[in-house]
């Protein structure tokens, strides 16, 4: 089971925000289904007036108080810094309690039997959730826990163009910007995508994790299938090997071709079986796994009987295939 609590609050009395409900709806939409429309997370969504102190705590307990494979909490709204702890501000905040303390959220995580526990906060001062020296030793990050926040302890989270800046990048990451070659999106790849998209003067996301391996949060469109990847890696006897090409691999190299003039045709002419292999190699090239050894383009590598080779990332996947990890 994969469960998620998604909270977005715009209508704070006297302190309205513009983008949080929109952010929550988009994150919920993306997490509920994978790109191929297969079911992903079961979603509980609390928006504006639904997002009271008691209601959020009740649903937080429901989402994290079982042995699910993945439990996720996303919050978009106001954050509050009271020196000793941070808080997410609920719709019914009052001067005596501005919302739910980060300490309380971490205690729910600590008590959870869920295998993978993920907290994503898009609010000001959210980075305090990862500052355990302020929250106390009782809430040291449990195994299987990942925290991703929009900004660091003393920073504000920014809204821009209909979304929070952080969540806009989170949405792009979940759409596929943070996917690997097989379409898998993990908390680590999301953080890397967001961090690399922000300038040095922008708010800085915080990422803390205590896991043995990252869980896949969503599957977007794959760039290559597992079958294609295994087939590709069999073309190279080792990670440093090259693959010999010749004109028979180039699909436009045949008598009567409209793409290549008669004087530029070369023997051996195109062969269908070699063309299938070349198509796979070109797909791998477009995804950064293979490159021509000496030519600028794969077309010239084939027509000039040159070779192609694995890139650094291609060598990594070759190793994964060799060791039957993929």
Which stretches of residues belong to each language-model region?
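Accessory beta->alpha helical hairpin/"wing" motif in late/C-terminal subdomains of nucleic-acid enzymes
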Residues: 223, 287, 291-326
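Glycine- and acidic-residue-enriched helix-capping/strand-helix junction motifs
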Residues: 12-26, 160
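Short glycine-rich His-centered loop
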Residues: 1-15
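Functional beta-strand-loop-alpha-helix junction segments that form "active/interaction loops"
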Residues: 28-69
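Short amphipathic alpha-helical interaction segments
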Residues: 270-292, 305
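Active-site-proximal C-terminal subdomain of hydrolase catalytic domains
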Residues: 8-9, 31, 118-208
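A short, glycine/acidic-enriched catalytic loop
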Residues: 16-22, 48, 55, 78-112
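Caspase-like cysteine protease fold
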Residues: 4, 179-270, 305-316
């Amino acid at each position: 089971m994969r469960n998620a609590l998604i909270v977005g609050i715009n209508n704070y009395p006297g302190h309205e925000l513009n983008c949080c409900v929109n952010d929550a709806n988009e994150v919920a939409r993306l997490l509920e289904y994978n790109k191929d429309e297969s079911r992903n997370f079961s979603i509980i969504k609390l928006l504006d007036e639904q997002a009271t102190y008691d209601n959020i705590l009740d649903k937080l307990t429901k989402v994290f108080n079982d042995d699910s494979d993945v439990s996720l909490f996303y919050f978009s709204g106001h954050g509050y810094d009271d020196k000793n702890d941070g808080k997410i501000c609920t719709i019914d905040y009052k001067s005596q309690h501005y919302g739910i303390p980060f300490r309380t959220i971490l205690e729910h995580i600590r008590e959870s039997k869920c295998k993978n526990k993920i907290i994503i906060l898009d609010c000001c001062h959210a980075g305090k959730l990862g500052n355990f020296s302020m929250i106390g030793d009782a809430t040291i990050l449990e195994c299987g826990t990942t925290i991703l926040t929009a900004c660091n302890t003393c920073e504000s989270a920014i809204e821009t163009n209909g979304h929070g800046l952080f969540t806009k990048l989170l949405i792009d990451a979940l759409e596929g910007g943070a996917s690997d070659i097989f379409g898998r999106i993990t908390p680590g790849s999301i953080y890397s995508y967001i961090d690399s998209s922000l300038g040095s003067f922008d708010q800085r996301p915080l990422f803390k994790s205590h896991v043995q391996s990252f869980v896949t949060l969503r599957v977007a469109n794959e760039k290559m299938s597992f079958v294609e990847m295994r087939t590709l890696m069999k073309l190279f006897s080792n990670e440093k090997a090259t693959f010999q090409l010749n004109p028979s691999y180039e699909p436009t190299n045949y008598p009567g071709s409209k793409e290549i003039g008669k004087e530029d045709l070369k023997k051996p002419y195109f062969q269908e079986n070699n063309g299938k292999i070349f198509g796979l190699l070109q797909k791998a090239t477009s995804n950064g796994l293979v490159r021509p050894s000496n030519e600028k383009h794969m077309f010239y590598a084939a027509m000039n009987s040159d070779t192609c080779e694995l890139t650094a990332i291609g060598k990594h996947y070759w190793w994964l295939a060799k060791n039957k990890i993929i």
